[in-house]
Amino acid sequence: MQQKDTYHTIAESSEGIYTEKRSKFIAIAFPVHTVEEVKGYLEECQKKYYDARHVCYAYMLGPERTNFRANDNGEPSGTAGKPILGQIHSNELTDILIVVVRYFGGIKLGTSGLIVAYKAAAAEAIANATIIEKTIDEEVTVAFEYPFMNDIMRIVKEEEPAIVKQSYDMDCLMTLRIRKSCMPLLQKRLSKVETAHIITE
């Protein structure tokens, strides 16, 4: 079975709005890659919506989708962050932060009402987003002698990896990036070139 080497994320920020019993829920989805980026967007939202009752969020990072967090920001436990994260999960997204800002309308929604509202707002932001597929890429460095440059370049032309860096001193070095599922064949072909050897970090 071929290993999955793609994942889905959003191309740019998007918004969704859900209103229930005069409470307004504004959801903003951001494409993110690091926890630092998440913190930056959260600070931005807290400043922009300083007068909101709650600023709740959930995020998921990395192709393996193992780095995630949900925060209720003062709402009853499990009524905000978890339903937002649930939408990220059910849409199989990663490298995404969804912030849902709540303006209280004076009428309490109850636990189930809050869960529905946060879920619906997050779903709306995802529905308004452009979903894109990305590949999980890996890098390999190959060392070889200059006379065999043409053999290496023929493989590069046929397998179409991206050339990350290259240097031509006594030994030639070339670092290539290609999607994970194509890496074994690339390494196999490179290692068959005379004088070539794969450098492992």
Label every PLM stretch briefly.
Residues 1-78, 199-201:
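C-terminal regulatory domains involved in ligand/effector binding and gene-expression control
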Residues 152-158, 184-194:
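Short amphipathic alpha-helices in soluble, non-transmembrane regions
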